[in-house]
Structure formats: structure tokens, C-alpha cells
């Protein structure tokens, strides 16, 4: 069973990220962590039901999980005491990347979520699940998401030195 969360209130924070404090930065990072977890969960459901796209699904699930893990560490550092705030100056400048990553993951989640017709079919006992992407589309998504993961990881490394 999936839990769906309306992230629109969190998007308000994206407009103020350029001058964000630790709590607002953590809220923005939390939004991406939440949506990453949902996308990874949806990918897992597809990997169980759709055998012919397993490799693509696993690749997409791995990169989304990697982004989630990096951002969980960023969030942990952002929520530390005020003594660490000056050290996180690079992380505080990630507003554009955070917003773009959130948008891409939100679009991905929308494409992976069950449609009304699928829900009706499930009620009738028919379990039809079709992977909505070609291998080429997955390759593009993975490449794009890898860039975000690298950006967030590098910012984290700079702030920890």
C-alpha cells in the first residue's frame, strides 16, 4: 500500500531557498526525500509485476534511492546545532538544483502512479501493469538524476571539509 502526500505546501519553501536557514533548507530536502522514497517504492512494485523491464526499473530505483540517501545526510547536517550553519554554505546554494530535482521526481511519480483504469481493473481481479518507459527514456532519466546526485554529493563534501 502506498501513501500519497500532497507536497504543494512544501513548494512554498522553494521560492525562499536562496536565503534559506537550516530549517527551511531541511524542509526542502525532506520534500525530495519523501518523493524519492515514493518513486523507489513504485519502481519496486513494477519490478515485481513487470519482468521484461526489470533491468531498467532496477537502474531507476537505484539512482532515486542514491539521491534519497545523499539528501538524508544533507538534511541531518542542516538540522544540527547553529555551530554548523556557516559550514553548510554550499548546501544552502542548491535551490535551483533542489527545485529541478523535485520537479523531475514529481513528474516521474505521476507517470508511475496507478491510473483510474488500472484501479478499476484491480477491483475486477485483473492485474495488469505495464512499465511506462522505453529503455532510452530510462537512460535519459537516470543520466539526469545522476547529475543531481553528483551535485548534492559534491556540495555535501565541500561543506564537510
Positions of predicted regions on the chain:
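N-terminal amphipathic alpha-helical segments
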Residues: 6, 10-93, 108, 112, ...
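Short, well-structured alpha-helical interface segments that form or flank functional binding sites
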Residues: 62, 96, 140
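Elongated alpha-helical scaffolds
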Residues: 96-110
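Acidic/serine-rich, low-complexity amphipathic helices located in mid- to C-terminal regulatory regions
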Residues: 100, 104, 138-157
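Individual transmembrane alpha-helices with interfacial aromatic-anchor signatures
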Residues: 128-140
Amino acid at each position: 500500500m502506498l501513501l500519497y502526500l500532497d507536497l504543494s505546501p512544501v513548494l512554498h519553501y522553494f521560492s525562499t531557498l536562496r536565503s534559506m536557514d537550516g530549517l527551511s533548507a531541511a524542509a526542502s530536502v525532506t520534500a525530495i526525500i519523501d518523493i524519492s522514497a515514493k518513486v523507489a517504492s513504485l519502481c519496486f512494485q513494477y519490478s515485481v509485476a513487470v519482468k521484461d523491464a526489470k533491468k531498467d526499473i532496477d537502474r531507476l530505483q537505484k539512482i532515486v534511492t542514491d539521491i534519497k540517501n545523499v539528501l538524508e545526510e544533507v538534511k541531518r547536517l542542516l538540522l544540527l546545532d547553529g555551530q554548523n550553519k556557516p559550514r553548510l554554505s554550499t548546501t544552502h546554494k542548491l535551490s535551483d538544483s533542489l527545485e529541478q530535482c523535485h520537479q523531475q521526481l514529481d513528474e516521474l511519480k505521476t507517470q508511475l502512479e496507478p491510473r483510474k483504469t488500472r484501479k478499476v481493473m484491480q477491483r475486477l481481479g485483473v492485474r495488469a501493469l505495464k512499465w511506462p518507459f522505453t529503455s532510452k527514456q530510462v537512460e535519459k532519466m537516470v543520466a539526469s538524476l545522476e547529475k543531481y546526485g553528483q551535485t548534492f554529493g559534491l556540495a555535501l563534501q565541500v561543506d564537510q571539509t
